[in-house]
């Protein structure tokens, strides 16, 4: 037996007996596990993102697989509590490690992995960095931090339809926003949108792509005909327009205050200390993430 398959089989056996993550059916046939609001630098354990699955009449689609093989195996075991149908697709909403490292749990016959056309390259570029995090926080050796890249790729501003059996889902890819690898998944039966990290509720939004692109993508999503949104982090909401507008307002404020700081020749550290502070009571982990967002956008905006 090849080593990678032995490892995957062995790991499934270890973790299958005691799943520790719980799922809620937020719409008919749509199950979500909410990750904890923890920062990667603070007690990261691979379970900080929302993950879940959609059950059709013939098959199942997994939406994000978690931050470790352990979480992926617990997800796989939990699915069997709700359905005996096969997992047909695993869809990653973007490249961040808390959403992709459970993929290896689902390797098998007739399982396709779906993602943004830029996702395979982005995963490869971050592989060594992610391995260091997995080793430091999860005690996972590098040779056991297994990346499974998508084999079905979607280009920006394009959508593809996949049928789970009388249940069609639409996967749409975007230009740079939260990252360069963002996709959303729309369940057409229930008008439910899995937004990935294009939406944060409660937790401070993260910019790892482009703030202007993020603002623009939110405008596009606001035009959709949907009833429920599942964010990448936080509570699913039917008040989804308010949630996106709250996030977008934060970005617009941050953009404008960083631009003003640059125009006034204010340095990066002072800008980190001051920009966006009026939003501090509205978001969790604000003191950690707001500064990172400024550190990301300040150098780019200096050249605008």
Residue ranges and their predicted role:
Residues 155-187:
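Core dinuclear metal-dependent hydrolase active-site scaffold
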Residues 63-65, 88-96, 114-117, 174, ...:
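Active-site neighborhood of phospho(di)ester-bond hydrolases with catalytic His/Asp-centered motifs
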Residues 215-266:
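Divalent-metal (often Zn2+) His-rich catalytic cores of metallo-beta-lactamase-fold enzymes
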């Amino acid at each position: 037996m090849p080593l990678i398959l032995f490892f995957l089989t062995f790991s499934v056996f270890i973790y299958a007996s005691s799943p520790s993550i719980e799922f809620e059916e937020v719409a008919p046939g749509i199950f979500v596990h909410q990750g904890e609001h923890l920062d990667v630098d603070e007690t990261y354990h691979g379970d900080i993102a929302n993950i879940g699955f959609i059950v059709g009449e013939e098959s199942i689609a997994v939406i994000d697989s978690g931050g470790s093989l352990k979480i992926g195996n617990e997800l796989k075991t939990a699915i069997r509590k709700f359905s005996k149908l096969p997992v047909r697709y695993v869809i990653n909403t973007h490249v961040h490690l808390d959403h992709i490292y459970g993929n290896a749990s689902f390797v098998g016959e007739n399982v396709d992995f779906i993602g943004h056309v830029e996702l395979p390259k982005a995963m490869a570029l971050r592989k060594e960095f992610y391995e260091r995090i997995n080793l430091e926080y999860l005690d996972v050796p590098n040779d056991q931090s297994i990346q499974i890249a998508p084999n079905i790729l979607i280009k920006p501003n394009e959508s593809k339809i996949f049928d789970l059996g009388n249940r069609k889902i639409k996967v749409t890819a975007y230009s740079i926003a939260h990252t360069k690898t963002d996709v959303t998944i729309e369940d057409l039966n229930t008008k439910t949108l899995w937004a990935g990290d294009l939406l944060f509720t409660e937790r401070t939004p993260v910019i790892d792509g482009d703030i202007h692109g993020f603002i623009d993508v939110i405008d596009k999503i606001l035009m959709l005909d949907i009833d429920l949104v599942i964010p990448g982090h936080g509570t699913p909401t039917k008040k989804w327009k308010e949630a996106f507008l709250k996030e977008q307002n934060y970005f617009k404020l941050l953009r404008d205050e960083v631009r003003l700081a640059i125009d006034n020749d204010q340095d990066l550290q002072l800008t980190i200390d001051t920009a966006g502070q009026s939003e501090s009571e509205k978001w969790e982990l604000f003191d950690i993430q707001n500064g990172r967002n400024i550190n990301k956008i300040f150098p780019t905006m200096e050249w605008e």
